[in-house]
Amino acid sequence: MSPQTETKASVGFKAGVKDYKLTYYTPQYKPLDTDILAAFRVTPQPGVPSEEAGAAVAAESSTGTWTTVWTDGLTSLDRYKGRCYHIDPVPGEENQYICYVAYPLDLFEEGSVTNMFTSIVGNVFGFKALRALRLEDLRVPISYIKTFQGPPHGIQVERDKLNKYGRPLLGCTIKPKLGLSAKNYGRAVYECLRGGLDFTKDDENVNSQPFMRWRDRFLFCAEALFKSQAETGEIKGHYLNATAGTCEEMMKRAVFARELGAPIVMHDYLTGGFTANTTLAHYCRDNGLLLHIHRAMHAVIDMQKNHGMQFRVLAKALRLSGGDHIHAGTVVGKLEGERDITLGFVDLLRDDHTEIDPDRGIYFTQSWVSTPGVLPVASGGIHVWHMPALTEIFGDDSVLQFGGGTLGHPWGNAPGAVANRVALEACVQARNEGRDLAREGATIIREASKWSPELAAACEVWKEIKFEFPAVDILDKKKS
């Protein structure tokens, strides 16, 4: 029997308090293929050894509590306990460590992100022995992944539904986000889609407020959708936000969207909750709806480098819970996002397999087997001058979403959409011809603007607009 296992049957029950590391720090342990692995950034309180801090995280997120209990003797701790099996000091930090914890698969309910997070990032984040705690990454085993449906459709199915290939998709968030009547809202949707966009979008906090009830919005948006499709000959979509105060109300809205013939609905997966999101994702697959996911509230969780949860974990959780798109930052826009870190979780969203990559903040090799990929959405403070960089950074399998960068055009909404479509087509053509978007991007946009007055006007309006603030969440310094 392992020396870490003390049960009533083996040694007799002894009341009292003992160090966590005596039971939960097991450096000799070799993780199993079926274990869920977690990498925590741990900042212990002064005087708390790293081994004790790592063991405390493993204990409090699995079977442990602050004192020995006699009911330990009624089960096998060796089978169910989490184990801190490796600790690395963080380079450049005096008292900070990456603690690796392995969790037996039996600790988690099948197909439930809610249960997985309740255990791994539950009460342990308020533990007094730690000054700060951050979950940097998870390795989800194939055996657990296969208990989830995942995204309703995935990248290839979405492209087939839309009949659009070889370029990023273009979107626009309708602004002002609050205050428009349903009819005026639908008018903006129509103008943007007619101008050349693939999608328009409800903002995350557009639900069913007194100035615009959800049913009215859905009806006017559906009218705009079908009218623009008839005029352009292209398949169009509007992300109808089904997020609501109850799961029942959320599902009622999704059902109505399907009855209208809408191709896509939307959900705020963090504020709405993983249980609601998984429920909606299952409905979307069964009924042919695409599912756009907004990450409202994510920065409360992931923006600080030392405490909370890195977005790559939330991205993996979304791929399990289900969504066809998710907002992933822009690198170049107004929202937080360091380039290498962003590309790391973009790979986790889209690829079937990712390897450990410290340069992108990826701590574990992750296989997704047959789970469909998710399209990353770049949105927030972007405009036509950003198009070359966005095309180069995110590639074809992405959605580039311009809200103010469409609706702020001096000539109106439709010309704003035209400007973005022309800029995108110019960048894709230049890339396909072998030109360097990173080096020649501005030249490519200027050349295209010579034969597009809409693009020329947009270039003039936003030529001085930049958001050059350093990212808060950056990669650790490399060891010398």
UniProtKB/Swiss-Prot annotation:
Q: Where in the cell is it found?
A: Plastid, Chloroplast
**Cofactor binding summary note:** Binds 1 Mg(2+) ion per subunit.
What is the source species? Rivina humilis
What HAMAP family does its record include?
RuBisCO_L_type1
Quaternary assembly: Heterohexadecamer of 8 large chains and 8 small chains; disulfide-linked. The disulfide link is formed within the large subunit homodimers.
| Chain sites annotated for binding substrate | N123, T173, K177, R295, H327, S379
Residue numbers annotated as active site: K175, H294
What job does this protein perform?
A: RuBisCO catalyzes two reactions: the carboxylation of D-ribulose 1,5-bisphosphate, the primary event in carbon dioxide fixation, as well as the oxidative fragmentation of the pentose substrate in the photorespiration process. Both reactions occur simultaneously and in competition at the same active site.
List residues modified as N6-carboxylysine.
K201
Gene that produces this protein? rbcL
Q: Known catalysed reaction(s)?
A: 2 (2R)-3-phosphoglycerate + 2 H(+) = D-ribulose 1,5-bisphosphate + CO2 + H2O; D-ribulose 1,5-bisphosphate + O2 = 2-phosphoglycolate + (2R)-3-phosphoglycerate + 2 H(+)
Instruction: Give the main localization category.
Output: plastid
Q: Where does Mg(2+) bind?
A: K201, D203, E204
- Name any one Pfam family assigned in the record: RuBisCO_large_N
At which residues is N6,N6,N6-trimethyllysine found? K14
Q: Which residues form the propeptide?
A: 1-2
Q: Please give the start and end residues of each transmembrane region.
A: none
Q: What is its EC number?
A: 4.1.1.39
Q: Is Nucleotide-binding among the key words of this record?
A: no
Superkingdom, taxonomy of origin = Eukaryota
Q: Name one GO cellular component term.
A: chloroplast
This chain belongs to which protein, by name? Ribulose bisphosphate carboxylase large chain
> Which GO molecular-function terms appear in the entry?
magnesium ion binding; monooxygenase activity; ribulose-bisphosphate carboxylase activity
User: Which UniProt keywords are given for this protein, alphabetically ordered?
Assistant: Acetylation, Calvin cycle, Carbon dioxide fixation, Chloroplast, Disulfide bond, Lyase, Magnesium, Metal-binding, Methylation, Monooxygenase, Oxidoreductase, Photorespiration, Photosynthesis, Plastid
**Enzyme's top EC category:** lyase
Q: Which family does it belong to?
A: Belongs to the RuBisCO large chain family. Type I subfamily.
GO BP term, pick one: photorespiration
